[in-house]
Swiss-Prot record:
GO molecular function (one): DNA binding
Domain of life of the organism encoding this protein: Eukaryota
Database matches in SUPFAM superfamilies: DNA-binding pseudobarrel domain
Compartment annotation: Nucleus
The protein's name in its UniProt record: B3 domain-containing protein Os03g0622200
DNA-binding region(s) from the entry: 29-124, 256-370
Chief site of localization: nucleus
Region (Disordered): 140-159
GO cellular component terms attached to this protein's record: nucleus
Keyword annotations from UniProtKB, A to Z: DNA-binding, Nucleus, Repeat, Transcription, Transcription regulation
Amino acid sequence: MGMLKIGKNCSVCKEWQEHCYWSHMADHSKHFLKHMVGDFTESMTVPARFANNFNGHISEEVNLRSPSGETWSIGVANSDAGELVLQPGWKEFVDGNGIEEGDCLLFRYSGVSSSFDVLIFDPSGCEKASPHFVGSHGFGRAENSAGAEQGGRNGRRTPPIVDGDNGHRHHLEMTLHRNSCRSIPRACKRSLFSDETEAKENDGEDEDVVAAAEGGRYGEYYFSRHGRVAEYNLREEDREEISRVPVPVQPGNPVFVQVIHSSHVRSSKYCIVGVSPEFAGKYLGAVEREVVLERASRGGEWHVPFVHRQNTRGFYGAGWRQFAGDNRLVAHDVCLFELTMVDAAASGGGNRRRRWSRRPTMTVHVLRRVRGRFVLLR
């Protein structure tokens, strides 16, 4: 009788635990595991129990973020058996991350708009190294591996961004394991430096084109003009829709609108998130300074350098990468940078003018397209 009673109680406890897990635990604490076997390269089925409990949270398109920070948009289809299947774009994700038969993928739901962080393990159960370096030659991403930016045990650190190719190259060359005799192979080193320089130049060119012309305005919204990368350009109807989204912007605060490029969230690349000359000139001035970014819905603040050069104005560096990573930004997100303004008495008169207090502070509101329309992320 005692054993039966214990068994019954355990069953009730398990049901209660299941309910608490799916209904009350934070979404970003939920995971599922998939072994890559059979014909895994063309599609992947989401476990039924996970899919059923996330009904309404998984949209027609999901974003998969690999360990490198690269993000893939994957289409979601329904099978004849009623299962959710990742299909359009899945093959590109598999090929891009070198996923092989026998590998195991751990998916962690990020809690926002059908986005998952993915860890990739080999058949031995060890995490694979190569997915950490997608889009690089294997060294830039290492600076953001476990413990690196927090002064981990291996003694590595994130090299600061240095103006000029020579300073940037010097810091990259010195990024070695303190207790290791291995160094970067010469051929890879040449490729790495050329890639970093090319990324710096290309990103700058794209941002200059985006920000060079006067941005379109809707009320206090400043929109960037079209750039060279067509997929990141906002159409007129997009701007109108964004202007209608009920974003909690304080009256009188100017807002700059920027579409996030893949290079803006790729931590292994040097890039600048461009700000239009009109907005920068009117509100931020021609001085390089630190800007504080905040998220009203999440709390916390991030200190991000604002650079002002001859052809480029915008955010850059480790501060921006930290902000993008902590807030799980993905390519094609739309960020609304709301500059917090206060009233100040104009010198020599009773009129009042609007300015930012102490240092520039911006509240960032993030929009993401879900099922064909822009929604505000919390």
